[in-house]
Swiss-Prot record:
Primary location class: mitochondrion
Protein encoded by which gene: MDM34
Compartments, as annotated in UniProt: Mitochondrion outer membrane
InterPro entries: Mdm34, SMP_LBD
Name of the protein this chain belongs to: Mitochondrial distribution and morphology protein 34
Organism name: Saccharomyces cerevisiae (strain RM11-1a)
GO term, biological process aspect, one: mitochondrial genome maintenance
């Protein structure tokens, strides 16, 4: 199936005039933007199609559709078309936003008058190739452009603005083929096949149609039956989104949770998070301590928070000595486990305190005794308590020797010199000693304790 355009239609200037009028109406439609630099409307001066456009039908569906509807896919090719438009723009940008701007923000200039610039734009050598979907229903034709390949030459009367306007026009051409041309072709087909009165009565204009859509969208209200069709999961997500909008409020709407958004902490719930942290301050802040009575109370004491960010014991606890070492150790362990939960190899740095015992008179007396040549540790051991008297024998000759009798049944151990059994490392490496129940009182004799190979000397 093929179609052929009537050359007489394109040769007659009436077709170009109709296209020019429709294009002027489409370009002068009310803009959605508040700010507009156009001082006057857009005037289409000339439209020319020197060559007949080519139309190739790629697909046509008539059988499956109703009789009043025809659907097809076509390829449109147009060459050497020309378009010339003219308008006036406002170069003083301060006047554009003067109505919507407060007077105290506007600068006081000496001359703030209007400065208009007429501009003429010419599009020549227009080449267009597009794949379109055509819908023919009753006397109207609807066309939607899918794949568009457009090329043209642009000339502007203001040369300094030519490159900027050309770049912006090429970026906004999708709006022309999406909105302007389909509405222009549809209105032209209505006026072509039907009378003007019937077309206006049956089909509203673009502005009325847009107003109808906006009014209908504002009056849309969900009925009770519509909520039954909604998914409960979607309703739950919507309710969570609505509740999460209270992040900037001064008072939290959810009392038992730290945040309405998972993973986020709100500012008004920061004190709850800090109060739940294990620390010495938070643990002892709940206890009541006696406060000093004073006639004047400062404002800082009235608004003093009940939590602190540092991990220290309060001064009142130290003064009253109401702390427990086991509780402090437990809190510090919880803090370490919380901070090193991801690191299993981390070891706590514990502070070790060595408690040294005070020196007793017996220890001071043992330090004054003569040291043995061997490096084995020797300390003083008292076999009986101090209160129990030790039986002593009479002095024997020579007078500088003294014998001591031990309470032990098996061995006789001297009172002042004995083996330190706690030093296991030294006794394991050295040979064992054999002690005799004699004690030298004068260091001038130079007697030595004997080993197993050489027994001690006797006189």
């Amino acid at each position: 199936m093929s179609f052929r355009f009537n050359e007489a239609v394109f040769g007659d200037n009436s077709f170009n005039e109709r296209v020019r009028e429709k294009l002027s109406t489409a370009l002068n439609s009310p803009s959605k933007k508040k700010l507009d630099i156009l001082k006057s409307g857009i005037k289409v001066q000339k439209v020319d199609f020197p060559t007949i456009p080519q139309l190739e039908i790629l697909d046509l569906d008539i059988i499956t559709q109703p009789k009043s509807l025809a659907k097809g896919i076509c390829k449109i090719s147009c060459k050497d078309a020309m378009l010339r438009i003219q308008t006036v723009i406002e170069s003083n940008l301060l006047l554009i936003s003067e109505q919507d701007t407060p007077s105290f923000t506007m600068p006081q200039l000496i001359n703030n008058g209007s400065f208009t610039i007429p501009i003429t734009m010419t599009f020549s050598s227009i080449e267009l190739e597009a794949i379109t979907n055509i819908f023919v229903k009753n006397p109207g034709i609807g066309i939607s452009f899918n794949d568009v390949d457009l090329d043209f030459k642009f000339d502007c009367s203001v040369k300094i603005l030519q490159s900027t306007i050309e770049r912006r026009l090429k970026e906004s051409m999708h709006v022309v083929f999406k909105d302007v041309l389909p509405s222009l072709i549809f209105n032209t087909s209505q006026n072509w096949f039907t009378n003007r009165g019937e077309s206006t009565s049956t089909i509203p204009g673009k502005r009325e149609h847009h107003h109808q859509q906006t009014t209908m969208s504002r009056n849309v209200i969900l009925d009770g039956s519509d909520f039954q069709e909604l998914s409960p999961i979607n309703m739950l997500r919507l309710s969570s989104i609505v509740s999460s909008r209270s992040t900037l409020s001064l008072h939290s709407t959810v009392m038992n949770s730290l945040s309405a958004i998972p993973g986020c902490l709100e500012r008004q719930n920061l004190y709850r998070f800090i109060s739940r942290m294990p620390s010495l301050n938070n643990y002892y802040s709940s206890q009541s301590f006696p406060q000093p009575k004073s006639s004047t109370v400062s404002s800082k004491q009235l608004v003093k928070p009940f939590y602190c960010s540092h991990n220290l014991l309060p001064k009142t606890v130290l003064d009253s000595s109401q702390y427990d070492l086991a509780t402090i150790t437990k809190i510090q362990s919880r803090l370490f486990d919380r901070s090193n939960s991801n690191d299993d190899n981390a070891k706590p740095r514990r502070r070790k305190i060595k408690c040294k015992k005070t020196r007793t008179p017996s220890n001071l007396q043992s330090q004054g005794e003569q040291a043995v040549d061997d490096s084995t540790a020797i300390e003083t051991v008292t076999s009986t308590p101090v209160q129990t008297p030790i039986p002593e024998l009479e002095e024997q000759s020579p007078p500088y020797l003294k014998t001591t009798v031990s309470i032990r049944d098996k061995y006789v151990i001297p009172e002042k010199i004995s083996l330190n059994l706690d030093s296991k490392k030294d006794t394991s490496k050295k040979k064992p000693f054999y002690f005799i129940g004699l004690n030298s009182q004068e260091p001038s004799n130079n007697w030595k304790w004997g080993m197993e190979d050489s027994p001690p000397p006797y006189h």
